[in-house]
A protein has these predicted regions:
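A short alpha->beta transition loop at the rim of the catalytic pocket in nucleotide-sugar-dependent
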Residues: 122-123, 141-143
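Short alpha-helical segment that forms part of, or immediately flanks, the ligand-binding pocket
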Residues: 116, 134-140, 159
Length: 224
């Protein structure tokens, strides 16, 4: 399971405690071996002297991306660049590119396998509160802003992350944007969030899973 503090919730849903192992969610080791921000920006061609907002929409390009992009552009200046990972949603990407064809600070990107580098390069990340992407963001230690969740498990993700200082969010789209921009402009708040991510995150979950499985195998062999 993602974290030991969630053990009681799983037990209440009928799963025996002895079946629960709080390893965290495994992520690619690419998120654990990231370059420094300046180096990542150099690799991606992102200006070193600009603020960088990263927006991830998921591989299918879901979310209120057009509305949020418009508000972020309106409420930031020329010193802030916005990078949108548009996934495979060609219609969304075309709409955004047409809308912002006259500005050099909105960058609409195709599906990429370099999300880890963009996280390393970004000052803050706006993303839907899916479990895997959120865990990757914590592993990358990027200041995290959760957008509107899908009712259900994503609601719980937002609650857990915000309660533990690992992200900010809001009840409305405007509140999400305001809280995100406040975080962007507050390096001390970003640093504090990274401390919380380091404290509560489990970036080495894959190792923990392997160790548990190997331990179970060894125990079974000893009993045989």
């Amino acid at each position: 399971i993602p974290h030991e503090e969630l053990t009681t919730e799983f037990i209440k849903r009928g799963i025996p405690a002895e079946k629960l192992v709080p390893t965290g969610i495994p992520v690619s080791e690419r998120f654990l071996k990231l370059p420094e921000k300046r180096e990542a920006r150099g690799q991606l061609g992102i200006p070193a002297d600009k603020s960088c907002i990263l927006m991830m929409t998921g591989s299918m390009g879901y979310g209120r991306v057009e509305s949020m992009t418009a508000k972020l552009v309106e409420q930031t200046g020329e010193d802030t660049h916005l990078y949108i990972l548009g996934g495979t949603n060609e219609e969304l990407k075309k709409t955004l590119r047409d809308t912002y064809a006259d500005t050099e600070r909105v960058h609409v990107l195709d599906f990429t396998t370099e999300a880890h580098l963009y996280m390393a390069a970004a000052d803050i990340l706006f993303t839907k509160p899916g479990g895997l992407t959120s865990t990757e963001a914590v592993a990358a230690k990027v200041a995290l802003v959760h957008t509107k969740p899908i009712p259900g498990c994503e609601d719980r993700n937002v609650a857990f992350f915000t309660q533990h200082g690992m992200s900010v969010s809001g009840d409305t789209e405007d509140a999400v944007i305001q809280n995100g921009l406040k975080l962007l402009r507050d390096p001390e708040a970003q640093a504090e969030m990274r401390k919380c991510q380091e404290k509560y995150g489990k970036p080495y979950a894959a190792d923990a899973v392997c160790e548990f499985i190997c331990g179970q195998k060894e125990a079974a062999q000893e009993e045989a």
